[in-house]
Amino acid sequence: MRLNTLSPAEGAKHSAKRLGRGIGSGLGKTGGRGHKGQKSRTGGGVRRGFEGGQMPLYRRLPKFGFTSMKSAVTAEVRLNELTKVEGNVVTLETLKAANILTKDIQFAKVILAGEVKSAVTIRGLRVTKGAKAAIEAAGGSIEE
């Protein structure tokens, strides 16, 4: 077997539909577009959300709420990720150094997911009740 003899498995590749190549092909003349109408023309079609002139759904419904930009710079940290941090003090900077958080994250919260194996000190991070109990049970502490 050589590189120039390789070929895909039988039936793995389908031949492309060749439109407008005669009556016998079954896709000649109109090429599967039917007769006349906007969708049969070149560049024909309607934009997303267009409902034929009827007031579209996205304009019938009222505006509400907004997306907080704080959510883009906030992250959750699982308990089992704390073991990747060097040393036993966990801060925002040490989490970034361990590649657990990206550099643009400004706020983080430790959540109860997984388990903490060693005693760690959490400094300057928010912690859920369950995570706090698990950290303290492992001999760790939380500093504000």
Swiss-Prot record:
Residue ranges, compositional bias (Gly residues): 21-31
First and last residue of the signal peptide: none
The keyword Transmembrane helix belongs to this UniProt entry's keyword annotation: no
A single GO cellular-component term on record: cytosolic large ribosomal subunit
Gene3D superfamilies, sorted: 3.100.10.10
GO MF: rRNA binding; structural constituent of ribosome
Organism superkingdom: Bacteria
Keywords: Ribonucleoprotein, Ribosomal protein, RNA-binding, rRNA-binding
Listed InterPro entries: Ribosomal_uL15, Ribosomal_uL15/eL18, Ribosomal_uL15/eL18_sf, Ribosomal_uL15_bac-type, Ribosomal_uL15_CS
One Pfam family this sequence matches: Ribosomal_L27A
GO biological processes: translation
SUPFAM superfamilies recorded: Ribosomal proteins L15p and L18e
Region (Disordered) location: 1-53
Self-association and partners: Part of the 50S ribosomal subunit.
The family this protein is said to belong to: Belongs to the universal ribosomal protein uL15 family.
Function summary: Binds to the 23S rRNA.
Protein name according to UniProt: Large ribosomal subunit protein uL15
Gene, per the UniProt record: rplO
